[in-house]
């Protein structure tokens, strides 16, 4: 290894090696994409990063994060999760490791959160301009007959999330079906009604369009990521007893807002 390092150092060629900015990791059910690589010591990073995971049955360390989407613009989280505190922290299973700690479908998640589930991911496209993937997430819920999520994003900061779920039995009016953890410690602005809602916070907008009447609300949630260790969660609940829900969510990131 040392001799190889010296050989590389003495070889003629470019002074830097280009690093890949995107990759799919089938063994982990995960796609990682960046608009650019930046030095870790960069004082003001500006790259957009998108991470999507379905999870696999062979994992040894898991949370109920099947379908999780994380978006980071420079230093600013746009879509996030609750993170991982000490495993013995109060509320670890319910507030962090479980489905509630992630931007995923919320109805009857398989428990415990540490139980791996065989959720599949198909990469439809992946290149420097963005990507598009689809996931089958039904096995992560005890009640879902079908549960799919498609995610498409571009380097311009547009993320489109297409969710569809059907249940083996109707769920009650007021049941939360989806949620999104967003990178704002302050309350967000919510407007709309029925099947059409819009959400805005510093650095991003979110448009939610459903196939039936829903209620969109927010709440403050703890996290183990960075100070102040709290952020807002957007919740989407059905307005009447339902056997499923289709929800299209479009997030537009302000690429200039990096911190």
Language-model regions: role of each:
Residues 1-259:
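Extended polysaccharide-engagement surfaces of secreted carbohydrate-active enzymes
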């Amino acid at each position: 290894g040392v001799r190889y390092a010296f050989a590389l150092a003495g070889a003629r060629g470019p002074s830097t090696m280009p690093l890949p900015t995107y990759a799919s990791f089938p063994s982990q059910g995960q796609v990682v994409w960046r608009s650019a690589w930046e030095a870790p010591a960069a004082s003001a990073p500006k790259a957009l990063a998108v991470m999507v995971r379905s999870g696999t049955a062979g994992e040894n360390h898991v949370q109920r994060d099947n379908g999780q989407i994380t978006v980071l613009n420079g230093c600013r989280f746009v879509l996030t999760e609750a993170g991982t505190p000490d495993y013995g922290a109060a509320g670890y299973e319910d507030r962090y490791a479980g489905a509630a700690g992630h931007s995923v479908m919320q109805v009857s998640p398989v428990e415990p959160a540490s139980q791996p589930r065989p959720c599949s991911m198909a990469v439809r496209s992946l290149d420097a301009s963005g990507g598009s993937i689809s996931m089958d997430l039904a096995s992560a819920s005890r009640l879902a007959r079908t549960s799919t999520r498609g995610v498409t994003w571009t380097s311009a900061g547009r993320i489109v999330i297409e969710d569809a779920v059907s249940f083996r039995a109707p769920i009650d009016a007021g049941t939360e079906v989806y949620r999104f953890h967003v990178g704002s410690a302050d309350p967000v602005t919510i407007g709309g009604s029925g099947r059409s809602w819009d959400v805005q916070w510093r650095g991003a907008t979110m448009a939610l369009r459903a196939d039936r009447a829903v209620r969109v609300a927010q709440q403050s949630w703890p996290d183990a990521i960075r100070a102040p260790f709290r952020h807002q969660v957007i919740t989407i609940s059905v307005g009447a007893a339902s056997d499923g829900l289709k929800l299209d969510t479009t997030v537009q990131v302000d690429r200039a807002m990096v911190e």
